[in-house]
Amino acid sequence: MEAEMLYSALALTFAIFMVYRILSNSQEKSSLIKLPPSPPGWLPVIGHVHLMKNLLHRTLYDFSQKLGPIFSLRFGTRLVVVVSSSSLVEECFTKYDIVLANRPQPSVDRRSLGFSTTSVIGAPYGDHWRNLRKLCDLEVFAPTRLASFLSIRLDERDRMISSLYKISSAGFAKVNLETKIVELTFNNIMRMVAGKRYYGEEAEDDEEAKRFRDLTKEALELTSASNPGEIFPILRWLGFNGLEKKLAVHARKTDEFMQGLLDEHRRGERQNTMVDHLLSLQESQPEYYTDEIITGLIVALIIAGTDASVVTTEWAMSLILNHPQVLEKARKELDTLVGHERMVDEHDLPKLRYLHCIVLETLRLFPSVPTLVPHEPSEDCKIGGYNVPKGTMILVNAWAIHRDPKVWDDPLSFKPDRFETMEVETHKLLPFGMGRRACPGAGLAQKFVGLALGSLIQCFEWERMSAEKIDLNEGSGITLPKAKTLEAMCKPRHIMERVLRQVSNV
């Protein structure tokens, strides 16, 4: 036992010494090229990791106020460059769009979270990624494909509205809006994917639904967890890989679940689902549309269609509850352009300009992925006059850009009206990224949010739980959830009573 402990101690000492030498050499090389400035406090082995706080985007914003719109950090052996200005973002994704089209490849198995070489989110830039992106644009997120699922989206919207009506038909009632939005969004996407409902009343097979909900919950927890082994590979060699084991187990369970869906649809009659459509493509090109590729596409679709939609809708409702004048203006627009004889439809969304302004302003203040998905240059380049070596991780702090007083008037205030008179420029408002690696599901997410938000405003009166404003503190994670679940009081609008009774079959 003593010999083993001595061996482990010697191995750890040697490993730390080697990492220190590597980092020292990299620091010496860095001094020979003009890297973006770094904050003080760099330490051997760990770099700047100890300076990172719980909300990464806010920590990076604080650094940018001292160091400027571009700066660099060391996360262990990894060089990270952070961009925090709209002008530099425009430079990155116009001049260097192809160079920056790569993604950093995780050293651990994150395929069940959408980051893998078979996923359009995480695949390296090249022919394979171009094929995946083309498939997404033409087959998965194509307007005609999404239009074929319109009846599903309307039905799930009606179910949510009916549920709220039954809760509040006697007068103002307390509702957990987060729960309702999660049920709406995940049922929407899973009916499109596989024709199944896994949340709320009338959910499919209880055991299967529970498996899916458990996988979703675990995925959320894993995306919020940090993995020191990715920053310090030596920890993986020494066995400190608890998160990696959890990721591997989650990936295996996700693969088994998705394979079960594929096999079930192979055995059954073809339906209008994304799984059936992809399986038909597999029949024509089996060498390319493997089960692994199809699973990667489905996972990407689930992620693209749920995360942004859930958090954006919840933030939007929180903001308008704190600004009743915005809620009233949106309701008047709906009453004028849609009326009271029917509920708002997706076809109404293009003409509901103020509703769209609310969505844009929500995405500005609370982008669902505040530092976007990281990029990695495939060759050395210069950004803002600084050298950025090949293989650097590049983070774009969209949260900081969206609150930049040089770009936005009164940037910390919720003012949807600002978008009524200004043209949206993608390098200034980029909640879904920019360039060729922008999120392919942005259009679907905005359809989800617009329809849900418009329906909630049109059909119900809303009030806060008390005179106190809704808490707008942010929670932790890759996405930007609220720290506190949104609860509110609602009751049916008298003028919409007849429509609500029809939808609720009462």
Curated annotation (Swiss-Prot):
Binding site for heme: C439
Principal location listed in the UniProt entry: membrane
Topology with respect to the bilayer: Single-pass membrane protein
Pfam family, one: p450
Cofactor(s) demanded: heme
Tissues and organs where the protein is expressed, per its UniProt entry: Expressed in seeds.
GO cellular component, one term: membrane
SUPFAM superfamilies: Cytochrome P450 (SSF48264)
Location in the cell: Membrane
Gene3D superfamilies on file: Cytochrome P450 (1.10.630.10)
Signal peptide: none
Transmembrane segments: 3-23
InterPro entries: Cyt_P450, Cyt_P450_CS, Cyt_P450_E_grp-I, Cyt_P450_sf, Plant_Cytochrome_P450_Monoox
Keyword vocabulary terms for this entry: Heme, Iron, Membrane, Metal-binding, Monooxygenase, Oxidoreductase, Transmembrane, Transmembrane helix
Class of this enzyme: oxidoreductase
Enzyme Commission designation: 1.14.19.74
Catalytic activity: (+)-piperitol + reduced [NADPH--hemoprotein reductase] + O2 = (+)-sesamin + oxidized [NADPH--hemoprotein reductase] + 2 H2O + H(+); (+)-pinoresinol + reduced [NADPH--hemoprotein reductase] + O2 = (+)-piperitol + oxidized [NADPH--hemoprotein reductase] + 2 H2O + H(+)
GO molecular function: heme binding; iron ion binding; monooxygenase activity; oxidoreductase activity, acting on paired donors, with incorporation or reduction of molecular oxygen
Protein role: Involved in the biosynthesis of (+)-sesamin, a furofuran class lignan. Functions in a dual catalytic mode. Catalyzes the synthesis of (+)-sesamin from (+)- pinoresinol by formation of two successive methylenedioxy bridges on (+)-pinoresinol and (+)-piperitol, respectively.
Similarity-based family: Belongs to the cytochrome P450 family.
Name of the protein described by the UniProt record: (+)-piperitol/(+)-sesamin synthase CYP81Q2
Native source species: Sesamum radiatum (Black benniseed)
This protein's encoding gene: CYP81Q2
